[in-house]
């Protein structure tokens, strides 16, 4: 099956004279319906990479294909219609005076007929559980609610791919959980491809696969289990340890023998219960 996204030897410089490219020889592919997290410290190139995928930035070298189309000036608008982006600060994304007006904005720009527009706005708000807030002013919403409305605005456009560019980084834990649960629900319903750009290791744990960026290069990729088993190597890259790994470190310091393989939070709970019952 042909990947929905293919990058081959991508290079990008913000200035031609830059000695160190923002992206250097980056290659990977993503399948339809996959959730891929791209992690790395600040300045690693992960957000630059996201902007090349939907054509906000054009690479200096290499090729990008989205939905089988090569990214170039002739195809860039077709590709942008396939890729929706949710950015870091929800307040910077609102243009409508009410929630429903804001969700309708992108549809108006595409010239969608009014009857279809009303239907799409209703459907999108229902899917992110914000239909009861349709007449509300965006400024009166919580951070998590604002991001759910931003997601609804993207969902209404019916893209094949959603990119979350640090979309949960300004939210409290409750808001972050709201957004992740919303994305999981929509992904399962529509077989959407999700790319999350994040430095939040716990958010990345929701992905099928993780790509690790460092100094503009792709340095590692694999399942969350594979990546998180690196342990202290993540800390050396400027990243945090996921909660289960932190718990394992704390238990080891107290003389408890813990599994060497990576465990999810659910797996850690199961292991703890089994350990207690076997004593």
UniProtKB/Swiss-Prot annotation:
* UniProt-listed InterPro entries: AAA+_ATPase (IPR003593), ABC_transporter-like_ATP-bd (IPR003439), ABC_transporter-like_CS (IPR017871), ABC_transpr_CbiO/EcfA_su (IPR015856), ECF_ABC_transporter_ATP-bd (IPR050095), EcfA_1 (IPR030947), P-loop_NTPase (IPR027417)
Chief subcellular location: membrane
- SMART domains annotated for this entry? AAA
> Gene3D superfamilies under this entry?
P-loop containing nucleotide triphosphate hydrolases
Localization per record: Cell membrane
UniProt binding sites for ATP: 40-47
Which CDD domains does this chain map to?
ABC_cobalt_CbiO_domain1
Q: What is its EC number?
A: 7.-.-.-
Q: What class of enzyme is it?
A: translocase
What are the entry keywords? ATP-binding, Cell membrane, Membrane, Nucleotide-binding, Translocase, Transport
Q: Which residues form the ABC transporter domain?
A: 5-240
* SUPFAM superfamilies according to UniProt: P-loop containing nucleoside triphosphate hydrolases (SSF52540)
Asked if the keyword rRNA-binding belongs to this entry, the reply reads no
Recorded GO cellular component terms are: ATP-binding cassette (ABC) transporter complex
Assembly with partners or alone: Forms a stable energy-coupling factor (ECF) transporter complex composed of 2 membrane-embedded substrate-binding proteins (S component), 2 ATP-binding proteins (A component) and 2 transmembrane proteins (T component).
The task this protein performs is described as:
ATP-binding (A) component of a common energy-coupling factor (ECF) ABC-transporter complex. Unlike classic ABC transporters this ECF transporter provides the energy necessary to transport a number of different substrates.
**PANTHER family xrefs:** ENERGY-COUPLING FACTOR TRANSPORTER ATP-BINDING PROTEIN ECFA1, HEAVY METAL TRANSPORTER
- What family does the database annotate? Belongs to the ABC transporter superfamily. Energy-coupling factor EcfA family.
What name has this protein been given in UniProt? Answer: Energy-coupling factor transporter ATP-binding protein EcfA1
Organism of origin is Enterococcus faecalis (strain ATCC 700802 / V583)
């Amino acid at each position: 099956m042909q990947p929905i996204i293919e990058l081959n030897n991508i290079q990008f410089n913000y200035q031609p004279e830059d000695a160190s490219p923002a992206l250097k020889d980056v290659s990977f592919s993503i399948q339809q319906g996959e959730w891929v997290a791209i992690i790395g410290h600040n300045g690693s190139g992960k957000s630059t990479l996201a902007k090349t995928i939907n054509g906000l930035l054009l690479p200096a070298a290499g090729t990008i294909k989205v939905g089988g189309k090569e990214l170039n000036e002739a195809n860039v608008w077709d590709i942008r219609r396939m890729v929706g982006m949710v950015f870091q600060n929800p307040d910077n994304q609102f243009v409508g005076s009410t929630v429903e007006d804001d969700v309708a904005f992108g549809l108006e720009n595409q010239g969608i007929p009014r009857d279809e527009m009303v239907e799409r706005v209703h459907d999108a708000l229902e899917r992110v559980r914000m239909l009861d807030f349709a007449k509300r002013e965006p400024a009166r919403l919580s951070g998590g609610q604002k991001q759910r409305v931003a997601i609804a605005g993207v969902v209404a456009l019916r893209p094949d791919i959603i990119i979350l560019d640090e979309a949960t980084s300004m939210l409290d834990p409750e808001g972050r959980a709201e957004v992740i649960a919303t994305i999981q629900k929509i992904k399962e319903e529509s077989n959407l491809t999700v790319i999350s750009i994040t430095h939040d290791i716990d958010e990345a744990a929701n992905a099928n696969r993780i790509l690790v960026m460092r100094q503009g290069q792709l340095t590692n990729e694999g399942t969350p289990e594979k990546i998180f088993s690196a342990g202290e190597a993540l800390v050396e890259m400027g990243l945090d340890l996921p909660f289960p790994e932190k718990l394992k470190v704390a238990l080891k310091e107290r003389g408890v023998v813990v599994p060497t393989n990576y465990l999810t939070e659910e797996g850690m709970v199961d292991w703890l219960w089994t350990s207690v019952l076997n004593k």
